[in-house]
Curated annotation (Swiss-Prot):
Keyword Oxidoreductase: yes
EC number, as in UniProt: 1.4.3.5
Keyword list, A-Z: Flavoprotein, FMN, Oxidoreductase, Pyridoxine biosynthesis
Origin superkingdom: Bacteria
Binding site for substrate: 9-12, 67, 124, 128, 132, 191-193
Organism, scientific name: Verminephrobacter eiseniae (strain EF01-2)
Ranges in coiled-coil conformation: none
Listed pathway(s): Cofactor metabolism; pyridoxal 5'-phosphate salvage; pyridoxal 5'-phosphate from pyridoxamine 5'-phosphate: step 1/1; Cofactor metabolism; pyridoxal 5'-phosphate salvage; pyridoxal 5'-phosphate from pyridoxine 5'-phosphate: step 1/1
PROSITE patterns, sorted: PYRIDOX_OXIDASE
Name of encoding gene: pdxH
Stated name of the protein: Pyridoxine/pyridoxamine 5'-phosphate oxidase
Subunit structure: Homodimer.
UniProt xrefs under HAMAP family: PdxH (MF_01629)
Amino acid sequence: MNLSIAELRKSYGRAELNEDAAHADPLQQFDQWLGQAIAAQLPEPNAMTLATVGSDLRPSTRIVLIKGYDERGIVWFTNYDSRKGRQIAGNPCAALQFHWVELERVVRIEGLVQKVSDQESDAYFDSRPLDSRIGAWASPQSQVIAGRGVLLANAARYGAQFMLKPPRPQHWGGYRLEPDLWEFWQGRKSRLHDRLRYRMAGGQWVRERLAP
């Protein structure tokens, strides 16, 4: 490569994040920013990085899609037997991060994770396209397989078995992260970025500005 990675840089300055304009409730602030990311037609504004830590204390990350949020927390769906599922079972502390590059914004969320109810998982599973529902059966997520043919053979087998109405596998469902910390980052000029952190203390959200 002729171009040095160290020379890659970008100036920020599209917007600002001030305490006077920011919501006192971080969920409302998140709702506003996510809505703006969707309105801006960003590619997959619902994509978020999920960080978990296993019993070996090694962290791992992956991209998942937010499928719902309210005062109870942030929801996504996945395979419970996957690496992330096993890590969450052993250590429910996790972190999420949204990065909306075009808006020069990042949102970080930390908290404890638990499974959503079977009713919530069933309702979302039944709303998915048929191929996705078959795929939940066909993929032994995070396991070593001999080749892609294994997945295709599994998909054909389960497709023939369940036809148009595959039930939700017991190893597949939703998780909800209940936030106890939020951080909103807005890129600013001269690397003097805006960072507002919300932390739960005494049952209330405390908002603080952090140095960038």
